[in-house]
Amino acid sequence: ILQFAFEDDNSSYLPYNQPYNCICYSGTHDNDTSTGWYDHAPEHIRDKVRRYMNTDGSQISWDFIRTCFGSPARIAIVPVQDLLCQGSEYRMNVPGVADGNWAYRIKDGLLTSDIAKRLRDITRLYGR
């Protein structure tokens, strides 16, 4: 889970530490969206993310997607909320909280041809 990669300098979650026979997730249903996670992370973590991903952070969800797809992991999985650059209010599940979970729905028109093209391009670029 890529969101876990930036807590320490030698994290096994960093892409360069991932073996081929694993799965790289930007986040899961039990994590915040990549945008939400980044927005709430301490500044020193955000700085590490920006340096690692060589980004200014303005498209952080797509930076997470690109980093997952570019990892050595055999499989890369990203939540649809990351494709849509959605924040914490679109989180799927908060473990230990009984109400309000699993209510996320994709509204008509959100998955545009521009997003499909961007996903297709990054998928081809990294041989996914």
What spans do the regions from the language model cover?
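Catalytic cores of glycan-processing enzymes that make or break glycosidic bonds
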Residues: I1-R128
